[in-house]
Amino acid sequence: MYRLAALVGLLLAPAAHAAEPARPNIVWIVVDDMSANFSCYGEKLIRTPHVDKLAAEGTRFSKAFVTAPVCSPCRSALITGCYQTTIGAHHHRSGRGELKITLPGDVVPAPVLFQKAGYYTCIGGFQATGDKLGKTDYNFEWDRTMYDGNDWAGRKPGQPFFMQVQLHGGKYRGQGPNANWQNRVKKELGANTDPAAVVLPPYYPRDPVILQDWADYLDCCRYTDKEVGDVVARLEKEKLLDNTVVFFMTDHGISHARGKQFLYDEGTHVPFVVRGPGIAKGATRDDLIEHIDLTATSLALAGIDVPKWMQGRNVLAKDYAKRDAVFAARDRCDETMEHIRSVRTDRFKYIRNYMNQRPHLQPCRYKDEKAIVQKLRDLHAAKKLDDLTEKLLFAETRPAEELYDLAADPHEVTNLAADPKHKATLEALRKKLAEWEESTGDRGRTPEPMAMYDSDMKVYLGGGKKDNTELKRNIELNKTWAKEGK
């Protein structure tokens, strides 16, 4: 059973400092593997009162998107306020072997900037026990000393703090339906979500395994909501809440066949809520923002100058210029090589598949260990999937370009790239994406050196007690495809 020991510690820690600092405390609540399935975002099947309250007492952003739909590139981008493709941190879990990645130029992680300004920096929650920090998952070399600890209780009297609370989120359900999680939900939340009541996207079959997994995922959202309430309750108990800006967001969407790792809204659209002094109450912002904007916004709220190299923007600034588009990138995930880019406006999404000769569901041990993916592959082999699911998930190749009218097609199932009526939109977004790749110095335009790939794969092959037969097969397949230009 998963434990969030550090979060419990957050609740039990004594109120160390009665006097509040003049500068606001900054708290990021960052959740793993979760889309915007909260009632304040329109989810009907479950109730999430604590996140809803946070939104009611603050500002909810309805169109927040991550620049990477998988943990480590997303978190590398977030902690620097830069696109992961600009800083060379775009491949998932890269730089973990003998070959390392260093940040370019003057770029430094945000905690360094907070420390220089006198803030106590800490990262707790999931993975934080004893002196161990909460989840970081950065794809570059960084200094442990940029964090003073894993809980704000260690700060000096009157010292403001920058705290990240990492929550397990969608990962609580594991790789598939399991009784341990379901029993824990029933014990702590009183009841489980009914799989029969689940509403799935149109491209997922209403199979019992897939329905149960989605119900378990919604219970992860409910449990996350409870944990958010626990964090806020401690701030209130210690009389810190009135001088603390609390941000709530997730690192990408639900882990599913078209969610995590992919650039559809299922993988990139995330909740983003902020509450605190000076923040508009009960407000909803419908303009497009990127998750790296959190970094610049937080620095500005703390009275810290936002560095010129930072690509995120202060979305609360009086002179803030709203984005007309947001961008995202998918590159290698674990052993699976990939290169996809996207640009999204209010109405349209353009996706460029640079490795379109490969299937959508490429072999990937992490993905293929999931019960839902195994079930989808079984149904595909038995020819029991409908035409839409077959086309979207199991076509042997993909279109080089995808274009979706999100107003008419929110699930992104009708590709308009070849439609003459949308030629002007296609060309405009194609150009916009190319300009972004050039202006931001997208490092994904150059293939990852095979030496770096091999260095990281040694880590994968050497870790844990898993049978690596499938992983070795996938690595060799990826190398073969790369040699063939596929």
What are these regions (language model features)?
Residues 18-24, 31, 36, 60, ...:
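Long, internal low-complexity/basic segments
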Residues 22, 42-48, 65-70, 99-107, ...:
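A short beta-strand-to-alpha-helix junction
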Residues 46, 236-290, 307-311, 328-329, ...:
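Histidine-centered active-site microenvironments of extracellular/periplasmic hydrolases
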